[in-house]
């Protein structure tokens, strides 16, 4: 899984201010009714393939009332409706991210996040010292640094000499990887967590694979997935003030990138509480779909718990708990190698763990589908993808086609025989195509360890499309930037520091903009209200500084959002 670090400057949210209703100081503006507006002289991409382009749109309050040319849309509003000329700039539906851990991203924005700041050990030493002195990295008694590049996990001995002695001898330190799956704990933290050689001896071979060990057979601090979860349990719960601050930071980050709605796929109690706090302050105007995690251990009990959670949050405005999230596997990069593959890793002879029993998972899928719940599965290896599709196939067979947009996400590797199954089963592919780059994360720490037949089909987006599948736009923020233009560029070019990652898997630019609008709304089961510029839909709109459909890939990549409008309200605008 390619782990790009955050590209947008951290803490930039503090520079953004929620703008009042309307377009203040707009060019070519004629005064009129505050509740009716016409945006005209624009290059409009509607997100509707039946009517993809227009030049004007009329808005009344929070809804779109007409789309077309200026004479046409003017008939739908009163003569004194406000008119705003956009001088030929691009107007799009608000972008929708179908896999964004936005509240976690907001927490990173207000924490000690090393993303894009640390590349060398010396830089890390300086960053950790500053985070300790300033208190920015202190979580209870633990010093936590977020967003570490994965290359550091190949240098655990050096990490130990830097952060387990001296001023850190009695200071628990947790370095969390940018992938959200891995980390490193110093000796003080390992001791507190009870992670010792004796503890590891009691684990099964599979369980031990989540912990790194040195040549002396002692834990070396590296942890992944279940090991990381054991460490994370020692972190204190966030206060309401911190949850609200993280939520506000997330909103402004998303708005600055033109993201007006998103699916939060790991909605634990703190995440849901943060959204409720935002709603209680009348600040949650974006539509957010949130999926609690289940494990397919006891399907009936787990789904009953989800229904209780839905009941508890049913009155939170703009928050929709309409599905469930499961992990089928982990990540593929060395040394983690917890992604489930159809062929074993060359260095271990293991395939990586499938994190559910296929029969239990099928039982869960049948029951969830019958209850009207969307199934959203982290499936990265080709073995996990195959198993996840088979579970959803069981639901389709038992219940017929419910029409629910069940979704797999990540799909770094897919076996060719599974390409048509996405279309056949009506399963959406929420791909993070920002990761489809030729670089260390897709070559050096992946290719030497994988069977050539598995490695060949890496981020096979075009193959899924050509077989009739639907791709929705997804970032996995804060694992990587939520910047849509960067993701579209990567999907179109697949260029990286080490060349091009299989150009045959490129995705046409316009298809990617459909992915981040209409298709993502479909993945959230909200296409009736958002995702396209069409009469009756919410007025979620973004103004872009250039014609992103026709400029070169590099010019498109550097595009900026000028205005972001959510439900008719301007929530972000540049100073220009």
Model-identified regions with their sequence ranges:
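Ligand-binding beta-strand-loop-alpha-helix segment within the catalytic cores
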Residues: 428
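Bacterial N-terminal signal peptides
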Residues: 10-22
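Acidic (Asp/Glu)-rich catalytic clusters
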Residues: 279-282, 309-315, 401, 422-424
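Bacterial Sec-dependent signal peptides at the C-terminal "C-region" and cleavage site
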Residues: 19-34
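Divalent metal-binding segments
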Residues: 30-40, 45, 49-305, 322, ...
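A generic structural signal for residues embedded in beta-strands
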Residues: 66-67, 145, 541-544, 573
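His/Asp/Glu-enriched, well-ordered alpha-helical/loop segment
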Residues: 366-376, 383-406, 410, 416, ...
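Bacterial N-terminal signal peptides that target proteins for export
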Residues: 1-13
């Amino acid at each position: 899984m390619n782990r790009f670090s955050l590209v947008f400057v951290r803490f930039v949210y503090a520079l953004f201010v929620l703008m009042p209703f309307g377009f203040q100081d707009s060019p070519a503006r004629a005064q009129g009714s505050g509740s009716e507006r016409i945006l005209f002289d624009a290059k409009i991409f509607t997100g509707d393939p039946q009517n993809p382009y227009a030049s004007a749109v009329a808005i009344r309050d929070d809804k779109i009332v007409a789309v077309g040319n200026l004479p046409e849309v003017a008939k739908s509003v009163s003569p004194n409706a406000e008119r705003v000329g956009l001088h030929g700039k691009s107007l799009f539906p608000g972008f929708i991210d179908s896999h964004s851990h936005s509240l976690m991203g907001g927490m990173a924005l207000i924490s000690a996040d090393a993303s894009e700041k640390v590349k060398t050990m010396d830089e890390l030493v300086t960053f950790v010292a500053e985070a300790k002195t300033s208190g920015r990295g202190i979580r209870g008694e633990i010093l936590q640094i977020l967003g570490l590049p994965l290359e550091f996990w190949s240098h655990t001995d050096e990490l130990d000499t830097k952060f387990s002695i001296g001023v850190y001898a009695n200071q628990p330190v947790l370095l969390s990887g940018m992938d959200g799956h891995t980390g490193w704990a110093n000796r003080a933290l390992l001791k507190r967590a009870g992670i010792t050689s004796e503890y590891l001896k009691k684990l099964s071979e599979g369980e031990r694979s989540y912990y790194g060990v040195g040549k002396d057979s002692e834990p070396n601090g590296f942890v992944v997935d279940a090991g990381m979860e054991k460490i994370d349990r020692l972190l204190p719960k966030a206060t309401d003030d911190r949850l609200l601050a993280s939520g506000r930071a997330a909103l402004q980050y998303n708005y600055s990138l033109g993201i007006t709605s998103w699916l939060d796929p790991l909605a634990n109690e703190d995440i849901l509480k943060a959204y409720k706090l935002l709603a209680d302050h009348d600040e949650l105007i974006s539509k957010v779909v949130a999926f609690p995690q289940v494990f397919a251990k006891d399907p009936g009990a787990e789904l009953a718990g989800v229904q209780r959670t839905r009941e508890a949050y049913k009155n939170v405005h703009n928050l929709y708990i309409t599905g469930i999230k499961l992990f089928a596997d982990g990540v593929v990069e060395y040394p983690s190698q917890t992604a489930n593959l159809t062929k074993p890793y060359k260095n271990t002879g293991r395939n990586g763990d499938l994190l559910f029993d296929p029969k239990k998972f099928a039982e869960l899928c049948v029951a969830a589908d019958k209850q009207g719940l969307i199934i959203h599965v982290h499936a990265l290896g080709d073995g996990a993808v195959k198993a996840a599709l088979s579970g959803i196939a069981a639901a389709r067979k038992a219940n017929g086609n419910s029409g629910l947009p069940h979704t797999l996400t990540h799909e770094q590797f897919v076996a060719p025989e599974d390409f048509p199954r996405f279309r056949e089963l009506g399963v959406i592919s929420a791909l993070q195509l920002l990761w489809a780059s030729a670089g260390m994360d897709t070559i050096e720490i992946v290719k030497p360890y994988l069977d050539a037949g598995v490695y060949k089909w890496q981020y096979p987006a075009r193959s899924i499309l050509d077989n009739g599948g639907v791709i929705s736009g997804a970032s996995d923020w804060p694992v990587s930037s939520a910047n849509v233009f960067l993701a579209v560029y990567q999907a179109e070019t697949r260029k990286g520091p080490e060349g091009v990652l299989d150009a045959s898997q490129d995705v046409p630019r316009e298809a990617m903009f459909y992915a981040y609008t209409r298709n993502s709304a479909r993945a959230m089961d909200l296409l009736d209200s958002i995702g396209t510029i069409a009469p009756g839909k919410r007025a979620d709109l973004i103004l872009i500084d250039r014609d992103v459909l026709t400029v070169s890939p590099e010019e498109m990549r550097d595009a900026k959002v000028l205005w972001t409008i959510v439900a008719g309200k301007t929530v972000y605008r540049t100073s220009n």
